[in-house]
Amino acid sequence: MRANSKAKPVSRAALAGEADPRLVALSVSIQDDGALYAEDIRGSQAHVSMLAAQGIVPKAAARRIVAALDQVRAEFAAGRIRFDPALEDVHTHVERRLGELVGKDAGYLHAGRSRNDQVALDERLFIVGACDRCDAALERLQRAFLGQARAHERTILPGYTHLQRAQPVSLAHHLLAYVEMFGRDRERFAEVRRRAAVSPLGSGALAGTTLPLDREAVAARLGLAGVTHNSLDAVSDRDSAAELLFACALAAVHLSRIGEELVLWTTKEFGFATLSDAFATGSSLMPQKKNPDVGELARGRAGRALGDLVALLAILKGLPLSYNRDLQEDKRPLLGGPEALVLTADAVAGAVGTATFHAERMEEALGSGEALATDAAEYLVERGVPFREAHEAVGKAAAFSAREGRPMARLTAAEWASFHRRFEKDVLRCFDARRSLKRRELPGAPGPRAVRAELRRWEKALGKARR
């Protein structure tokens, strides 16, 4: 594109002279919104086609504009468009290059449209696409977790509360917890997409236009569900952007949780898992190191995602109706957030899908019964003892076990009976982890049948998603 910094920007038609270079430097946004070129061109093609159908623009001119915009899109994609700060934003860059290709016909394009409703459409189109990309990445992540869960139905490990051993669960149940989280994330992205998929074009700067536009036709051409209903709101609404970044932030928080577990589980102290070499890094100094950078970066990226959300909300706070230039600053958090999530999700999917989980070490970590103390309390409850009384009795047994230096599973039947008269010899059966799991078959529980039911449910759900 031929740069022409002396040409007066279209927004200065009523102003004398040129803008001060300091204002130009502050105002330029092409370095950020240039990433929206595909959405901007797509919206322009739908808009000019509608203008022609409504008799506002000659059909031949509209056809030339649509064809030329295809060329502009290709030039952007190939990196052949040189950004000119004097042209400020992506809209002006597209229109200027269009003018070089079709001459005065380019002047038809902006009829009935403002950059205010134009950029609102660009962002909505971006959000719809971003939701689809995030959903696809999260589905890939779910499949990675589901594959490992299916392979580890019989692997038992301690479940943790407060990072202290609590009760036994299967590794499949543990991994399915993340499948659930990512399922909720996908639902959120679907909701964001649904609300974003309406067209603001026709809202103009803030009060529509006197031209007989067909707003619904533009929405239909773009594959959107309908149109916005208030022009003031439409040009200043960034709710969908905020919702998208919230969905990204919460998904990133979920990724940070598995990231933390990958870091912990791959330590010698835990020894629950080993990352494949393809998803580990070394040290520039210590040749023996195998570092879980993928988990650490997942934790770190969550901080960035939270920052993007807070940055956008701070920009929106206190803005009067309708459009304000503050909204130019929404591009950096909006455009970077979804792509960072996709990148992180794919890396974590690869790390989890290729990791080795050490079943023997996990089962060793259950210890000799402490994680099954609740089963002993419920043993009494099944015999008519109030739970608080049962809880106190087992607590005394746990304290005695610690003082004696003997695991609870090694206490004698007589010792158990000393803590409560309803304890009998068969209380020792409570300290069999596999038996314990088999007795936990409520829906959503870690029992083998319950876990298999959840595996089948998710396999069916993801199978439908693939089709």
From Swiss-Prot:
- The answer to keyword Amino-acid biosynthesis applying to this record is yes
* Enzyme nomenclature, EC number: 4.3.2.1
Q: Subcellular location, in the record's words? A: Cytoplasm
Among Gene3D superfamilies, the record links this protein to: Fumarase/aspartase (C-terminal domain), Fumarase/aspartase (Central domain), Fumarase/aspartase (N-terminal domain)
Q: Look up the record and name the pathway of this protein.
A: Amino-acid biosynthesis; L-arginine biosynthesis; L-arginine from L-ornithine and carbamoyl phosphate: step 3/3
Q: Does the keyword Transmembrane helix apply?
A: no
Question: What Gene Ontology cellular component terms go with this record?
Answer: cytosol
Q: Which reaction does this chain catalyze?
A: 2-(N(omega)-L-arginino)succinate = fumarate + L-arginine
Q: Name one Pfam family in it.
A: Lyase_1
Write out the entry's keywords from A to Z.
Amino-acid biosynthesis, Arginine biosynthesis, Cytoplasm, Lyase
> Which family, according to the similarity comment?
Belongs to the lyase 1 family. Argininosuccinate lyase subfamily.
**Name of this chain's protein:** Argininosuccinate lyase
Provenance organism: Anaeromyxobacter dehalogenans (strain 2CP-C)
Q: Which gene encodes it?
A: argH
